[in-house]
């Protein structure tokens, strides 16, 4: 039995994301005074009284003909269908609007249990005058809270728990592979996530930057759990002026750091850009598993050698990621998405691979005999032995006589030898030099 699902819905700027963040205890949804800053469904696991449930934060409901608004409304309808319980958040200071009335009408039709949450009540013994208008929505007694300062949120969670059915034993028996989907704006990240999920869960538009939040979306593929992190497209920080966009960029960086495997999405039409290089550098720096995903491959005129030429172009521009596999896909047509998930499994396995010390040192000795390390000012570098000290990424300690004698080119040689013998496809390798109790 799966965990129960609670969805937070309401019109823009009533405090849904603030309540979401208050419940889960982290700043995951972007909170801003600008209406409509949460466009997509955000998923997070929440716990109260030892009970675990999934919490969904949705974009603000607005009933207009605007393209993004229409798509957001579709997202919310899907969230309502998925939810076991709905928290309908209203602004107790502003009172009822026509949008509130329209949302309430839809919720009454849904036949789902609803808690009407009256937000922005700092003193629930003396609520704002407009608080009492909320009774007119026909959804029962408004529950007063202040998401900003936490007033009455604990009591709200008590009520939530009382209305949910929980499995007797919930065990996370399968480790979850965390996948960050990263890239510049409008290269098809959201379309790729939706294609993998088989539904439109992330707002997709031709307008660059329509995904503002890093959205954690659970999925199952061939009986295994994954967590997809669809990040806001990263722009150069120098071009970002609004606090909202700057926070989105920082969130994208955090998404890379949280991931096991990063999918670097590149547009087949545009090729590798300077911004792609910067994002690739972040993935490499943080030591994540990485797959280079060339999207929109269906739009390219091809011959028998097009893919090989394109791969050469990628490795020329991203020379430091030559260990990363390249796959050509189309989120629009679904081309090679099964192969992509197979690659994710393979890179995840390599990212956490561990090599026995005895085998590692046998390969190391052969490498040193075949190509001895160069001497520096007459002093030879001696490598005594190696051992693997970490995974995610695989990290090796090399015990030497003098760490300053190790040239970066020889470390690169050893890295290539380790890859030839042990694989490590799609993952950074790191080396730590140790000598006489010192670490460098």
UniProtKB/Swiss-Prot annotation:
Which InterPro entries does this one have? Answer: AAA+_ATPase, G_ENGA, GTP-bd, GTPase_Der, KH_dom-like, KH_dom-like_a/b, P-loop_NTPase, Small_GTP-bd
Q: Name the GO terms of the biological process aspect.
A: ribosome biogenesis
Residues at which GTP 1 binds: 10-17, 57-61, 119-122
Q: Its Gene Ontology molecular function terms?
A: ATP hydrolysis activity; GTP binding; ribosome binding
EngA-type G domain: which residues? 4-168, 177-352
Binding of GTP 2, residues: 183-190, 230-234, 295-298
Q: Which UniProt keywords apply?
A: GTP-binding, Nucleotide-binding, Repeat, Ribosome biogenesis
Gene3D superfamilies assigned: 3.30.300.20, P-loop containing nucleotide triphosphate hydrolases
Q: Does the keyword Metal-binding apply?
A: no
Start and end of every KH-like domain? 353-437
Q: Check the record and name the HAMAP family matching this protein.
A: GTPase_Der
Give the quaternary structure: Associates with the 50S ribosomal subunit.
**Protein task:** GTPase that plays an essential role in the late steps of ribosome biogenesis.
Family, per the entry? Belongs to the TRAFAC class TrmE-Era-EngA-EngB-Septin-like GTPase superfamily. EngA (Der) GTPase family.
Identify this protein by name.
Answer: GTPase Der
**Species for this entry:** Carboxydothermus hydrogenoformans (strain ATCC BAA-161 / DSM 6008 / Z-2901)
Gene that this sequence comes from: der
